[in-house]
Amino acid sequence: MKTFFLIFAGIITLQSAQAQLKASSICPPFKVDIMDGNVNELYPKSAIEEIKKIFPCSSEIVEQSTVSRCAGIFFKDKDIYFYTERNYFEIGPNFKGKINPPLMGASRNSLFKLLGHPKIKDISWDAFQMGYGTLVLYYNKAGKINKLQISSKSTDALKLCE
């Protein structure tokens, strides 16, 4: 019986000795440059590997698009999503980072001086043609920006994920 107990205790000890502590990945602060169309110098055409190198703390990676999902690297806790196959970023209302200029929460009526007239206008969003491609701004019922998308594509070629 002692032998059995010693063998059992040895196995438990060996298994716990193999357990390793792993440090969680820490990301640098997210910095969005609206006028240049980048996030920490990453552009909408950046590949998943480039994004992972700068931001190793993603919450989900989808390598290949499917019928129900677009490929990309996602940071749900930071409310920022990189859709790599469609070449755009999406920044939500709970974004944890800096946006320059600080558009999140800005009034729809205050954008003309900065962005000019939108190329496409809808009730709840505007699409602006930028030097890098397209900036799409979404508005809440109060007319304040609550989501934005930065794409390397023109408004005519833009395809967004659902």
Predicted region positions:
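Short helix/turn-capping signatures at newly exposed starts of structured segments
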Residues: Q18-I123, N140-E162
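Low-complexity, intrinsically disordered Gly/Pro/Thr-rich segments
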Residues: G131-Y139, G143
